[in-house]
């Protein structure tokens, strides 16, 4: 019987890897894309929809769930899996990114970060110990440590000071929940901005702490694609090879392909569902905007190469009509398709790595998104 936290690599192709991470709520095959369920639900879709399209793990947001409905209320309901009826694994972030995005509404100290709720202005304090407590109440399969995500453009002195504090916070998180304490896994988050030596320092310090996996944080925060790829390809291979590697909040299909190429195992992003609500849909021929007049009488499927419910059942003309009529069904059908696209991408990557053909697989996506590919290795 597999042990919770066990990460087994099944194949590699260059730096790309495929394997399985065992969690309390089942296995997660990597590389994997995690749909984002900020407040406990993935926008526009139900758990049955997610199950039908092959989602294996979703993400919840500690900050938002703490403020509403409250982590203690969720705990009284039996945890987030019971509360939202998603029986497979859940990863919760620490809420740090959201808190630091509040800018003028927060204050950072060694103790933690004090902030005011965006809902009612009430004052709160997130300490490393507090965010662990919240996530244990949520009973997520994977908990993330509290970290400071420094803003893009922060100077090296500030980034270095922030990094040292983030490392101390990471140790406090682990002290609050030692390895092997229960069924919840805990990942550390490497930081360091866009300074390679600080990134290396962060990895060196964090890997001395016994985390179950490691994340690259602080990317996709306003930098250019070239800058992001430079840090990604430099740092990803430095993360422990025997632990899962997670690229937080990134990104486009080509970002994910490049992340896999650099040795990353796990991804999350709001892009597929956010773009679905805006009418931007991903297809095997690239992105299309379903709002456009050219689709008004198009009886063909959204993507003839996709087998999702949306593509099997409805025409582009109908999807365009739903969007312009502002029907809620539009959000659901578009989200089902976009999420299927992202999940098919990582499913195909797993197969290509196992077959030793990932370079060829990557080249297909480079051809679909040539302008973006020109900015990537």
Curated annotation (Swiss-Prot):
<keyword id="KW-0479">Metal-binding</keyword>
<keyword id="KW-0862">Zinc</keyword>
<dbReference type="InterPro" id="IPR050076">
    <property type="entry name" value="ArchSynthase1/Queuine_TRR"/>
</dbReference>
<feature type="binding site">
    <location>
        <position position="308"/>
    </location>
    <ligand>
        <name>Zn(2+)</name>
    </ligand>
</feature>
<feature type="binding site">
    <location>
        <position position="147"/>
    </location>
    <ligand>
        <name>substrate</name>
    </ligand>
</feature>
<comment type="function">
    <text>Catalyzes the base-exchange of a guanine (G) residue with the queuine precursor 7-aminomethyl-7-deazaguanine (PreQ1) at position 34 (anticodon wobble position) in tRNAs with GU(N) anticodons (tRNA-Asp, -Asn, -His and -Tyr). Catalysis occurs through a double-displacement mechanism. The nucleophile active site attacks the C1' of nucleotide 34 to detach the guanine base from the RNA, forming a covalent enzyme-RNA intermediate. The proton acceptor active site deprotonates the incoming PreQ1, allowing a nucleophilic attack on the C1' of the ribose to form the product.</text>
</comment>
<comment type="pathway">
    <text>tRNA modification; tRNA-queuosine biosynthesis.</text>
</comment>
<feature type="region of interest" description="RNA binding">
    <location>
        <begin position="249"/>
        <end position="255"/>
    </location>
</feature>
<feature type="binding site">
    <location>
        <position position="218"/>
    </location>
    <ligand>
        <name>substrate</name>
    </ligand>
</feature>
<comment type="similarity">
    <text>Belongs to the queuine tRNA-ribosyltransferase family.</text>
</comment>
<dbReference type="InterPro" id="IPR002616">
    <property type="entry name" value="tRNA_ribo_trans-like"/>
</dbReference>
<feature type="binding site">
    <location>
        <position position="306"/>
    </location>
    <ligand>
        <name>Zn(2+)</name>
    </ligand>
</feature>
<dbReference type="GO" id="GO:0002099">
    <property type="term" value="P:tRNA wobble guanine modification"/>
</dbReference>
<protein>
    <recommendedName>
        <fullName>Queuine tRNA-ribosyltransferase</fullName>
        <ecNumber>2.4.2.29</ecNumber>
    </recommendedName>
</protein>
<dbReference type="GO" id="GO:0101030">
    <property type="term" value="P:tRNA-guanine transglycosylation"/>
</dbReference>
<feature type="binding site">
    <location>
        <position position="191"/>
    </location>
    <ligand>
        <name>substrate</name>
    </ligand>
</feature>
<dbReference type="InterPro" id="IPR036511">
    <property type="entry name" value="TGT-like_sf"/>
</dbReference>
<keyword id="KW-0328">Glycosyltransferase</keyword>
<dbReference type="InterPro" id="IPR004803">
    <property type="entry name" value="TGT"/>
</dbReference>
<dbReference type="Pfam" id="PF01702">
    <property type="entry name" value="TGT"/>
</dbReference>
<dbReference type="GO" id="GO:0008616">
    <property type="term" value="P:queuosine biosynthetic process"/>
</dbReference>
<feature type="binding site">
    <location>
        <begin position="93"/>
        <end position="97"/>
    </location>
    <ligand>
        <name>substrate</name>
    </ligand>
</feature>
<keyword id="KW-0671">Queuosine biosynthesis</keyword>
<feature type="active site" description="Nucleophile">
    <location>
        <position position="268"/>
    </location>
</feature>
<feature type="binding site">
    <location>
        <position position="311"/>
    </location>
    <ligand>
        <name>Zn(2+)</name>
    </ligand>
</feature>
<comment type="subunit">
    <text>Homodimer. Within each dimer, one monomer is responsible for RNA recognition and catalysis, while the other monomer binds to the replacement base PreQ1.</text>
</comment>
<dbReference type="GO" id="GO:0046872">
    <property type="term" value="F:metal ion binding"/>
</dbReference>
<dbReference type="GO" id="GO:0005829">
    <property type="term" value="C:cytosol"/>
</dbReference>
<dbReference type="GO" id="GO:0008479">
    <property type="term" value="F:tRNA-guanosine(34) queuine transglycosylase activity"/>
</dbReference>
<keyword id="KW-0808">Transferase</keyword>
<feature type="region of interest" description="RNA binding; important for wobble base 34 recognition">
    <location>
        <begin position="273"/>
        <end position="277"/>
    </location>
</feature>
<feature type="active site" description="Proton acceptor">
    <location>
        <position position="93"/>
    </location>
</feature>
<keyword id="KW-0819">tRNA processing</keyword>
<feature type="binding site">
    <location>
        <position position="337"/>
    </location>
    <ligand>
        <name>Zn(2+)</name>
    </ligand>
</feature>
